[in-house]
UniProtKB/Swiss-Prot annotation:
Belongs to the elongation factor P family. The lineage of its organism: Bacteria, Bacillati, Mycoplasmatota, Mycoplasmoidales, Metamycoplasmataceae. PANTHER family: ELONGATION FACTOR P, ELONGATION FACTOR P (EF-P) FAMILY PROTEIN. This is Elongation factor P. One of its GO terms (cellular component) is cytoplasm. Pathway: Protein biosynthesis; polypeptide chain elongation. The gene is efp. One of its GO terms (molecular function) is translation elongation factor activity. It is found in: Cytoplasm.
């Protein structure tokens, strides 16, 4: 059992028969009332993100999640196909469970699958990934005041805002949690 007061990002727990991972947790106390915990959590079975509220001190069951490295092969539209790098066994995960993560996946990338007992739930990416810029408009002269940004397209099809100096063909570091530009990758 785990106390909701100890919630922090990355903690996995079971509630109402579903498995959740904490993305954010906010603790609040008002006057003489009881403390409350509001947690932004991801349902690992459905892939949906919800806000759950708990009265402080409530206990929930800890979910022991096994993580195993696998290589991303491809997506067939309905499922993503991953291969165990040791046994060469292939597994499928519904695209609906990994829609956000698909923005950062490229062929051959090593990811971790999350398993609860024998049930494969979803995948976990590194906090940051290096991806190549495939489309980047030229910087417009005179449009350089107040931290100018431009929208670029990555090799995975994901679009994000980057500084004006980023050009096509460059490799950049992107946060998989926020989808934001982190910096240039070392060449």
């Amino acid at each position: 059992m785990i106390n909701v007061n100890t919630f922090k990002p990355g903690i996995t727990f079971e509630d109402d028969g579903d498995i959740f991972v904490v993305l954010e947790a906010q603790h609040s106390k008002q006057g003489r009332g009881q403390a409350n915990v509001k947690a932004k959590v991801k349902n690992l079975r459905t892939g949906s993100t919800v806000i759950k509220s708990y009265t402080g001190g409530v206990m929930v069951s800890r979910a022991h999640i096994d993580k195993r490295p696998m290589s991303y092969l491809y997506s067939d539209g309905e499922n993503i196909i991953l291969m165990d790098t040791e046994t060469y066994e292939q597994v499928e995960i519904p695209v609906s469970h990994v829609e956000w993560e698909l923005n950062f996946l490229k062929e051959g990338m090593i990811v971790k699958i999350r398993k609860y007992k024998e049930e494969i739930l979803d995948i976990e990416l590194d906090a940051n990934v290096v991806l190549e810029v495939t489309e980047a408009p030229d910087a417009v002269k005179g449009n350089t005041a107040n931290n100018p940004q431009k929208k670029v397209k990555l090799e995975t099809g994901f679009e994000l805002e980057t500084p004006m100096f980023i050009s096509e063909g460059e490799k950049i570091i992107v946060s998989t949690e926020t989808g934001k530009y982190v910096g240039r990758a070392n060449k």
